[in-house]
Amino acid sequence: MSMKLVKRVPTGEEIKELYPLSQELKDIKAKRDEEIRKIFTGEDKRFIFIIGPCSADNEDAVCDYQNRLAKVAEQVKDKILVIPRIYTNKPRTTGDGYKGMLHQPDPNKASDMLEGLYAIRKMHIRAIKETGLTAADEMLYSENWQYVDDILSYVAIGARSVEDQQHRLTASGMDIPVGMKNPTSGDYTVMMNSCLAGQHPHTFLYSGWEAHTDGNPLTHCILRGALNKHGRSISNYHYEDLRLLYESYQKFNLVNHSCIVDANHNNSGKKFDEQPRIVKEVIHSRNYDPDIKELVKGVMVESYIEDGNQPVGGGCYGKSITDPCLGWEKTERLLKDCLLYTSDAADDLIGVD
């Protein structure tokens, strides 16, 4: 056979018993979840920043970054709510390359997914304990949800997973916001249908059980750019793209109309230095159009300690080993700039025509 079963993996409950969340951290998560929920329902008008490394490759570097981020998050909290990105599993276009801490707790060693499950849970818990900020992660594998359902405050479903039925149905059973990215083709209808599936109740097989869900009213869209037939990046963060999404929402029976704009990936053409400009243009569009302001709840930014990226084993602390990221100094400046840009009557500061 081409597939071999290597080792039994513990259930979510078994791993939670090994690495439990204290009552103090449970209370932090409950408070954070409520704050974030209110932004997606429109009760809280703050702007969301989902920000952090492309991939969480090293616990110490990631937690160092999160501690820096927490200090700035405190300074901007009146206008901006920060959700750290701690992405522990990575989709790979060709199947090659570093697939995240779940696969390789140590990027320089062989894959060990059991140790990876331990590692991602320990890192998420450490980050909450040190910073008081619960995080976002990508749901690359739908069955992984059972291992992190008590520690995450936001989940993204990627461009290659968004059409998958198991991802959609699993999202319908979550009680936190789930962002559905547009597929690599850029088709809004696929993304909207994913949101529709996520907001409806379902019965399906999950992790050896027949499961029933109630539907997730916080399922929403993420615009991340697209690829044309020649493999070139097409952005979809401009004003006309946001208007098109607003109009698309009117045609679907969805609640809590919301969008997050991913400032990297095909929106930037993976030119990480473009992210601050893209974020500011999105805020400009929000300030210009009340409909867009109501729709666009925030942005997603890839950021780490050092600018750019490096190969696995490159040896530079806090530098991405997957997609290039914005360095810390530029990240801090962006957040503080956006504190001004999201304030009342501040649009003239942005300088975007």
Regions found by a protein language model. Give the residues of each.
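Active-site-facing alpha/beta catalytic cores
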Residues: Q66, K79-L244, H265-K270, E274-E281, ...
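N- or domain-start disorder-to-order transition segments that initiate the globular core
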Residues: V6-F40
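Acidic (Asp/Glu)-rich catalytic clusters
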Residues: T41, A127-E130, N253
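Conserved, mostly hydrophobic/aromatic
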Residues: G52, V261, G327
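Metallocofactor- and cofactor-centric catalytic cores in central/energy metabolism, strongly enriched
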Residues: K29, E35, A56-D57, V62, ...
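Conserved small/polar residues in nucleotide/adenosyl-binding loops
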Residues: Y341-A346
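Internal helix-turn-beta structural module
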Residues: Y304-L339
